[in-house]
Curated annotation (Swiss-Prot):
It holds the Pfam family PdxJ. 3-amino-2-oxopropyl phosphate binds at N12, R23, G200, G221, F222. It is found in: Cytoplasm. It comes from the Bacteria. This is Pyridoxine 5'-phosphate synthase.
Amino acid sequence: MPKTPPLRLGVNIDHIATVRNARGGRHPDPVRAALAAIEAGADGITAHLREDRRHIRDNDMERLKAEISKPLNFEMAATPDMVRIALGIKPHAVCLVPERREELTTEGGLDVVGQRESLAPSIARFNDAGIRVSLFIAADPAQIEMAARLKAPAIEIHTGAWCDAITDDEPAKAAEEWRRIVAGAALAQAAGLEVHAGHGLDYATAETIAALPQIVELNIGFYMIGEALFVGLGETVKAMRATMDRGRARVIAA
């Protein structure tokens, strides 16, 4: 039996910047948060530079690239301006996401099938630059297969619908969404894609999904920043890391 790969924790620091921007100025500093998360055990940092700059700013991305010791995952819409910025910063990875100005957060997965003609050149440019590309998509077979055809090295499965169904106490819907995630992760791995997951994850759902052996990275932000208000960011990262390790141990023990 092949060895189960370790599970990485990427901490999304967007909402440190949300708090900062509520009053303007430089406090709290998202780069300081990133450094604290890494010190506590984060394997990487995720930040989303939105077109409207509602939280993370250009200078934040530049400082993150310069100051953190772990990989930077640059979330972005695949627009010409964002592609230019990302190529200039040269993060370890980019995650291409859909984006609408009126949304509170990223509401759905990228339509890779419908946007394949526009996405292909951006993916190729990042591949040529040595920047690892992931596509934030639903666990839909057509989207997964197109991601592989476009030569994206990785996908990030959108876990929001599953997490929302659990929060809303809709067990039938949660079970259906979970089946899609399980099948999607297996299909993606079979297609040669590295599999990540994220959106809406908390301690309970992170522990559950950590048991899927195909998934090698979880990107978690909003829940952790909320928990950090009560116990501190370092303690939250340590608790999430321990939670993920418990879930992963179930794979190893199986």
